[in-house]
Amino acid sequence: MIFQIDEYLRLFIIFVPQIFMVGLFSFLIFKMLRRNANRNSLTLSCFYIFVSLGLLMNVIAVLIAFFSPGEFIGTLYFFATFLTMFSFVFVVVFILSLLKLKYEFTLKKAFVIILAYGIAWLILHLYPSGVTYPERVPVYSIPYFIAANILFTVSFTIPGIYYSLRLRRLFKDSDLKRKLSLFIIGIALAIVLVYGLILYNTWQDPTFKTIYGFSIIVLLISSGLLIYYGMGRDL
């Protein structure tokens, strides 16, 4: 019975909120690029694009796992997780672009950071026996759990918060400070979301998975909107 509830909960989390979030993020991308397709708006749009692609991959993976499980599920989950984690590098690059301006933070430097970030997460995702798929869902091993937490902390949490706070100190206008505060709160919620997701795929406690399964919806929508209304809307 618990397994059945968990399965239907997963389907609810996938079809209703995640499809809605893909539509919402697509709308935000459209608004940013229609207003001004400059370097900063393109960079931040990439964050929403890769998150949306990760969500779509996850939808497909859960559909196949539920109706026709097979070895291909692992590949879909691989891309879903990788695309989602890879998206956060564009937030870091976006902040650095605002902080150092395009004349100092060149496209070449941005590309190097994006490439290094992608390689680091690709190596982690290829970790031997790091992820297994009992009962048609991904389960992280303890070594993988530790490595993922360390990598996310080093690659996003520390630089994301540090450079955001540095950027806030540079702003003198109170309205800009308020908007950047919303942006920072959005980043903080995204950080909580990712750490929770890593734990969600590691700790197989039904109560935690049910509660956090619903929390994911609130955290992802809130973080996405706060990041947009904080800095993305006025690019």
Where are the regions a protein language model picked out?
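Extracellular-loop-to-transmembrane junctions of the mid-late helices
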Residues: 3-20, 120-165, 210-212
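C-terminal transmembrane-bundle signature of multipass membrane proteins
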Residues: 155-235
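Individual alpha-helical transmembrane segments in multi-pass integral membrane proteins
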Residues: 8-22, 41-104, 108-118, 149-153, ...
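Juxtamembrane "helix-exit" motif on the non-cytosolic side of transmembrane helices
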Residues: 60-69, 125-137, 195-205
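N-terminal signal-anchor/start-transfer transmembrane helix
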Residues: 18-32
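Short, hydrophobic transmembrane alpha-helix segments
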Residues: 4, 28-38
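Aromatic-anchored segments of alpha-helical transmembrane domains
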Residues: 51-56, 115-127, 188-196
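Membrane-helix boundary/juxtamembrane motif in polytopic membrane proteins
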Residues: 40-41, 103-113, 140-148, 164-189
